[in-house]
């Protein structure tokens, strides 16, 4: 998923509260922070999206979570900031695998705006 560089920002407390209200799993994540406090200097919206992506996949019934599951961000390109997602689907039947993987990426792409981010689209 390529993220539009111009949509990156450090989240305000209000923005984080809105994200946690809209996406309950993120509120659970916030409660795991030491004393409920954010890291010094704040936290970026793309980092919250990566955190959400990992939580979503680890709890998805079709994902084989005990196997490698990696959500990583690479260097910015002319097409935006790539967020790579590596995971394994439990079902190995090709058609079912493709359908489940597509459903997961549909969800991830549709939730990007909740984090104040935009998917890069070439003009």
Give the residues covered by each predicted segment.
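Structured, soluble regulatory/oligomerization domains located on the cytosolic or IMS-facing side
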Residues: 1-123
């Amino acid at each position: 998923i390529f993220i539009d560089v111009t949509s990156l920002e450090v989240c305000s407390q209000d923005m984080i509260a809105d994200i946690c209200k809209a996406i309950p799993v993120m509120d659970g994540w916030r409660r795991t922070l030491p004393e409920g406090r954010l890291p010094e200097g704040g936290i970026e919206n793309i980092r919250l999206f990566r955190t959400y992506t990992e939580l979503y996949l680890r709890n998805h019934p079709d994902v084989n979570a005990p196997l490698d599951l990696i959500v990583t961000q690479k260097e910015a390109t002319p097409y935006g900031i790539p967020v790579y997602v590596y995971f394994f689907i439990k079902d190995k039947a090709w058609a079912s695998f493709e359908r489940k993987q597509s459903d997961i990426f549909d969800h991830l792409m549709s939730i990007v705006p909740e984090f104040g981010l935009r998917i890069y689209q070439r003009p």
